[in-house]
Swiss-Prot record:
Mechanisms controlling activity: Allosterically activated by GTP, when glutamine is the substrate; GTP has no effect on the reaction when ammonia is the substrate. The allosteric effector GTP functions by stabilizing the protein conformation that binds the tetrahedral intermediate(s) formed during glutamine hydrolysis. Inhibited by the product CTP, via allosteric rather than competitive inhibition.
Annotated positions binding UTP: S13, K188, T189, K190, P191, T192, Q193, K224
Additional facts recorded: CTPSs have evolved a hybrid strategy for distinguishing between UTP and CTP. The overlapping regions of the product feedback inhibitory and substrate sites recognize a common feature in both compounds, the triphosphate moiety. To differentiate isosteric substrate and product pyrimidine rings, an additional pocket far from the expected kinase/ligase catalytic site, specifically recognizes the cytosine and ribose portions of the product inhibitor.
Origin species: Syntrophomonas wolfei subsp. wolfei (strain DSM 2245B / Goettingen)
Gene3D superfamilies in the record: 3.40.50.880, P-loop containing nucleotide triphosphate hydrolases
One BP annotation, GO: 'de novo' CTP biosynthetic process
Spans annotated as Amidoligase domain: 1-267
EC numbers for this chain: 6.3.4.2
GO cellular component: cytosol
Annotated residues for binding of CTP: S13, D148, I149, E150, K188, T189, K190, P191, T192, Q193, K224
Name of the protein: CTP synthase
Keywords assigned: ATP-binding, Glutamine amidotransferase, Ligase, Magnesium, Metal-binding, Nucleotide-binding, Pyrimidine biosynthesis
Function in brief: Catalyzes the ATP-dependent amination of UTP to CTP with either L-glutamine or ammonia as the source of nitrogen. Regulates intracellular CTP levels through interactions with the four ribonucleotide triphosphates.
């Protein structure tokens, strides 16, 4: 029968519950167990799809088209499996479902309340994965911090699940902070004691404490935490700050967290196989080269807005023993100061996805700089659309070419709304979302790095390249190297006579894994390494 692990957080937010959950998933999978992960977010939005990146960070898209929390990206990357829409659920989704049931009369005249109706719906969401995929372990992360009003229904639901499922099938892990007081030179346990007290007042006694800390915990301190938080000494696990998130599974393994879970849940499993992960973690410290990638975006002051892109660049860098330095560049700053001023010292350029007109001309100027100076370039989603606009304006001499998103009256709408998107009223979950097949054209750069004739990639967009201008742009040197099976949607473009100028309509960052970097990121990093090794600036400018 499926066993359940619930991860809560205490003292402060942003402790790394998601990384802890993902790392635990990796450890248990390494022992031959089938693992599923999910995240519950206590906000009232139905999903993060319409939220500002400044509020939420990136929106991570699953293979089946769900717009989810960025922690789902960590889950997929660490356990190296595709998750589904079951991996993320919000308060808004729960309430929407309950209200829909009430309107249909499913509750047969009952007064609909937080308990039992909301909590029952949460419990159904937790156990739904068991019915769909029959995993050995479901790891559920509860967003927010213990003590938040918003999290109370979720905490009550997971409290009830121990009663419903049985004590031998449920385990609670509390991730907490042990702050170091510089003036006193001491680590303090009192915040954790109060956090556990708050959790116990709700009816949940944590089985294991994962203690985030800047300093090593002494045996005396661990014993104190065990005594006052009423957990076994072996269940006090320290998790110091790590140089790389990919070290965290090994740090938890050294603390024997997986063994403690196996013992408590009575799991039967094989010896841990972490050979591949150990090699990955050691590679992080053997990087003997360095390149700089200029990332030109709208939300660069919040790197979490581009989290999967950052991790994908790192994955490719690991394969080439290369450290990736990212130069974060405001697209609007490019408009004011010029592309050459800001990009002259980078080894490669990436324009990520985004929405809205702000900074667009800066991104278009960036694409022009990469094309004219033969700088390795990767455009993603809106990044590809900007590259197309630039090519149409400056190579095809289509004066005023633009996307109908930014200029509905453009004489050359080289990017336009996809069919069926014209009169969409509700913005949530209405884009082209999730995995779609893409056919690759032999003899192209894209085909060379993929090494296959067809692949599947994840999308999140409303606009597409306008096929009306396709032939004219191809006649001027645009290469269409990836296309939908019906031949209608341009998925990947590149340029003739350029060593690496590739752009795609989809989001390759959602398919990259630390042990299997995405081919397009591999191509960008290889191109950047070659570019950096060119003998002089003149040759770079071609």
């Amino acid at each position: 029968m499926t066993k359940y692990i619930f991860i809560t957080g205490g003292v402060v937010s942003s402790l790394g519950k998601g990384i802890t959950a993902a790392s635990l998933g990796r450890l248990l999978k390494g022992r031959g167990l089938k693992v599923a992960l999910q995240k519950f977010d206590p906000y009232i939005n139905v999903d993060p799809g319409t939220m500002s990146p400044y509020q939420h960070g990136e929106v991570y898209v699953t293979e089946d088209g769900a717009e989810t929390d960025l922690d789902v990206g960590h889950y997929e990357r660490f356990i190296d499996e595709n998750l589904s829409h079951y991996a993320n659920c919000t308060t808004g989704r729960i309430y929407q479902t309950v209200l829909d049931k009430e309107r249909r009369g499913d509750y047969l005249g009952q007064t609909v309340q937080v308990i039992p109706h909301i909590t029952n719906e949460i419990k159904d969401r937790v156990t739904m994965i068991e019915k769909e995929n029959s995993p050995d372990i479901v790891i559920s992360e509860i967003g927010g911090t213990v003590g938040d009003i918003e999290s109370l229904p979720f905490l009550e639901a997971i409290r009830q699940l121990k009663f419903d499922l049985g004590k031998d099938r449920v385990l609670y892990i509390h991730v907490t902070l042990i702050p170091y007081i510089e003036a006193a030179g001491e680590l303090k346990t009192k915040p954790t004691q109060h956090s556990v007290k708050e959790l116990r007042s709700i009816g949940i006694q944590p089985d294991i404490l994962v203690c985030r800390t800047q300093k090593e915990l002494s045996e005396d301190l661990k014993a104190k935490l065990a005594l006052f938080c009423d957990v076994d000494r072996e269940a006090v696990v320290q998790l110091p700050d790590a140089e790389s998130i990919y070290e965290v599974p090994l740090m938890l393994a050294r603390e024997k967290l997986d063994l403690e879970i196996i013992r408590r849940l009575g799991l039967e499993c094989k010896q841990a196989d972490l050979k591949e992960w150990k090699e990955l973690a050691s590679r992080v410290h053997r990087l003997d080269k360095e390149i700089c990638i200029g990332l030109v975006g709208k939300y660069v002051e919040l790197p979490d807005a581009y989290l999967s892109i950052v991790e994908s660049l790192k994955h490719a860098g690991f394969q080439y023993n290369c450290e990736i330095k990212i130069k974060w560049i405001y697209a609007e700053k490019v408009e004011k100061e010029g592309a050459e001023e800001l990009l002259q010292n980078v080894d490669g350029i990436l324009i990520p996805g985004g929405f809205g007109e702000r900074g667009i001309e800066g991104k278009i100027a960036t694409a022009a700089y990469a094309r004219e100076n033969r700088v390795p370039f990767l455009g993603i989603c809106l990044g590809m659309q900007c590259a197309i606009i630039e090519f149409a304006r400056n190579v095809c001499q289509m004066k005023g070419a633009n996307s109908s998103e930014f200029d509905p009256d453009s004489p050359y709408p080289v990017v336009h709304l996809m069919p069926g998107q014209e009169n969409v009223a509700n913005k949530g979950a209405s884009m082209r979302l999730g995995g779609y097949p893409c056919r690759l054209v032999e003899g192209t750069l894209a085909y060379g790095v993929y090494g296959v004739s067809e692949t599947s990639e994840r999308h999140r967009h409303r606009y597409e390249i306008n096929n009306e201008y396709r032939k004219e742009m191809e006649s001027k040197g645009l290469v269409i190297s990836g296309i939908s099976p019906d031949g209608q949607l341009i998925e990947i473009i590149e340029l003739k006579e350029h060593p690496w100028f590739v752009a795609c309509q989809f989001h390759p960052e959602f398919k990259s894994r630390p042990n299997r970097p995405h081919p397009l990121f591999m191509g960008l990093i290889k191109g950047a390494l070659d570019y950096k090794e060119e003998p002089d600036t003149a040759s770079r400018e071609g």
